From Swiss-Prot:
PROSITE patterns, per the entry: ZF_SWIM
Listed name of the protein: Zinc finger SWIM domain-containing protein 3
InterPro entries reported in the protein's UniProt record: Zinc_finger_SWIM (IPR052579), Znf_SWIM (IPR007527), ZSWIM1-3_helical (IPR048326), ZSWIM1-3_RNaseH-like (IPR048324), ZSWIM1/3_C (IPR045563), ZSWIM3_N (IPR048325)
UniProt-annotated stretches for the region Disordered: 434-490
Swiss-Prot/TrEMBL keywords: Metal-binding, Zinc, Zinc-finger
Amino acid sequence: MELGSCFKTYEDFKECFSAYKKETRCSFIVRDCISVRFHNLNNGTSFREDILYVQVKFVCIRTQSNRKKTRKVDRCPAYLLLQYNETLDRLFISELNTQHIHADSNASGGIPASKPQAICLHKLPPVQLSIRKDLDTAEKPSVEPSFCLDKIHKPSNPEQEGISPSDMAKIAKVMKNFLTVDEGSMASFSVGTSQDLDRLSFQSSKMSDLFARFPETLLLHRVENSQGHILYAFLVENKERESRVVHFAVLKAETAPSVAKMLNIFTEFNSDWPKVKMVFVDPSFPHRAILQEIFPSARTLLSIYHTTRLLEKKLHQSSVNASFKRLMKEALREAVFVSSDASLKNLCEMSQVLLDEELFSFLQAHWFSCELLWYIHVRKGLHACNTYMDSLDIVTSKVSSLFREQRSLLDCILHFVDYIDFFNTKGLKSLPTNAPKLRRTRLPSTPPRPKKPFRICGGGDTRLPVEEVEETKADSAQSQLPQPQDQSSKAGMLDILHQSGSELAYKLCHNEWEVVQNSTHLVDEAGSSVAVQLLENSHQVSKDGCSCSCSFQQCYHLPCRHILALLHTSQQPVGEAMVCCRWQKKYQHLLDPNGELQDRGIIPNTDQPEKQGQNHMIRDLSRELANLLMQTEGPELEERCSTLRKIVDIWADPYQLPESSQQPVDFRDVGCLPFLWGKLEEADSPPLAEAMVHD
């Protein structure tokens, strides 16, 4: 390891760094880091993900030689700073201090202290958190602060739009169809005394499988729309620290009984609920006592994600100066992504200036000083913290935007049922505008999950027999998303453009309209203008970049926008294998400018009217053969073209051949005509021969 050493990927550095640690018999930990995903998300860059970090600092923390389970931290000034250089497109060691100072430095085998290559510029606070010995000591449920009490027994919004009996019937049909087409899915809703929807809970079979795989931690995300309806999304965390939705619940009013019923339904749907060890909630969640009662073996903790977003919101709304905002943003970033006692203490002191006394006291008691919370956060790995925060940003933004943009609760429910499995897609994938089919294929080796009957809860639970679900198959089309009322006006808009504009203008605008129809629209007012963002449907691109599931690539066999985006991310050029033969210059001699097979051996006699129809059929057949041939590649394409030419020459009228065709023409002999396109073994491949065409 030398100052200025460069590495193409993080794996290359890791291999060299491992050899260095083995040689010096010293251990290093990450003290400070900025991941590529975090940097790309916040700065709009597209750095390669295989470099893993834009900047990372390793400090020496060598383990004692007595091999005890506990580690003693040596206060050693040795460190290494690895940074990414965009110009070089390489990771390089920008700072290096090899001055190891240990209690047993003579036996450490490290580099002598008299040969430092750099000077330690500054001393960062230790990353280790002071963890209490007894982490299993249960905390008594605290009294909810006043900023949470306004959500307890909150009356329903008088401006809420009631659901008519016809809408209730539509919801019932949609949920029955949802249960029919997705075996293992579950749903339940209750109707109040006013015959209005009080609560709706549902989850797909994929969500059930996700919770069964990762039941240890549960996070509740709360969204409220303009009409006062409440949506709760239940999320779990997989081993890569990516958040996944496992349950949805919609409440007309957030009261203690409705929340208790919602949580009880979740436990009924998921038999692995006793495995939940921790439940993370928003700081404003007012029903912690109910949550503790239904999950008695789980600890209720404040979500790091939601508390961080709360502090960011408070900072944005405050009137403090720009310098303080910048310093607190940096302190918040260090506390979350480089957690340590010092960083948490610094953030706590700055938050005291920003927050009111009650909220600050609540966060100080349940977030800043919660050793179990930060111990778990650090234990799972600070390097994966970016993944955790980014995945929550993606999932919660999808859920919140879809729930808040709908005008009615009925439309909202219909959209969530249709898009239920699109919330757990990797990356920022859009929700398709067209209603997707809920039918799914199940592997033959996977047994179908036991089906729970659909329930409508009124004064008491009424269970519908499963046989009744079959009656709704004929009406399943009606239970899909209702067609927009202004569909005719949209079609009329295109008709007017077609009538008043040129053909080219209409075609170009129609292409844009197709993009709009296959996208999710994020529209927000930004001052005097409107910010519009289109999120297109996701498509599957092969790793070699030769194929994509989009219609453009399937039709033209050219690199589409999705393949080009993949190549741009990996900084690779377009390869020859990504372009179909019909677009390559070296195969253009096989086609004429009109895209038809070139064959100068036949000149149609247009003076004979009775043969004009035959000539048209020949042209059509020629175009079709050209399209079929150009779907093949390389030698196979040349072989098939040579075979077709040979057949045409045999069938051609000798009197119609021009003088130029009387000359010998070279063909590749591929065998007897009945087996012209058969695959021959290499040993049986015939030699090249000359075929003479005589008059």
